[in-house]
Amino acid sequence: PMPPEVDLFAAPCGSVTAPAGCGKTQLIVDTLAEHTAAKPILVLTHTNAGVAALRARLAQCSVRASAYRISTLAGFAMRLASRFPLRSGISANVLALDDPKRDYPAIRGAVGNFIHAGDINDALRATYSRLLVDEYQDCNVAQHRIVVALSKVFPTCVLGDPMQAIF
């Protein structure tokens, strides 16, 4: 387990690097259980299976659903591009994912650009209190750019283990 002095609320930006089985996911659960602010914490990870596993653990620990919003990085990027189509510059056929191998990278790139430009910072700040990214070692360059841009908007902590990287 993580030592009690690891406090994800303590720093505006940070990272937790630890090997498998050391409690990174439990640290996220514990942090969300302690969260009392009105706005939820945004939690991003890479796979739908990761989202489902985290949701199950949060439910098992009776963490209030209002304390968090969980999504994959791809799902979050898609939601932002869909919600702000003019600012993202993404066409409807790309949002329809007619060619996912082409469209997902285009969406990630566009979302990284418009978050970085600051076009939606106020909307993001009004929606979320902070960001936690699980399995950060699996981020590609475009996903990393999104996370870095978000870290300029609200407090951010990334958690991962480079020895577990799958990409």
Where are these regions (language model features)?
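Conserved catalytic network of the ASCE P-loop NTPase/AAA+ motor domain
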Residues: 8, 36, 123-124, 149-152
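Loop/turn-to-beta-strand initiation segments
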Residues: 40, 129-130, 153-157
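Conserved helicase motor core of SF1/SF2 NTP-dependent helicases
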Residues: 17-24, 48, 137-167
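Conserved helicase/translocase P-loop NTPase motor core
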Residues: 96-129, 140-146
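Inter-Walker segment of RecA-like/P-loop motor cores
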Residues: 62-113
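P-loop NTPase Walker
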Residues: 1-83
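Charged catalytic and DNA/RNA-contacting regions of genome-maintenance
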Residues: 134
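Short acidic/histidine-centered micro-motifs embedded in hydrophobic/aromatic stretches
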Residues: 76, 127, 150
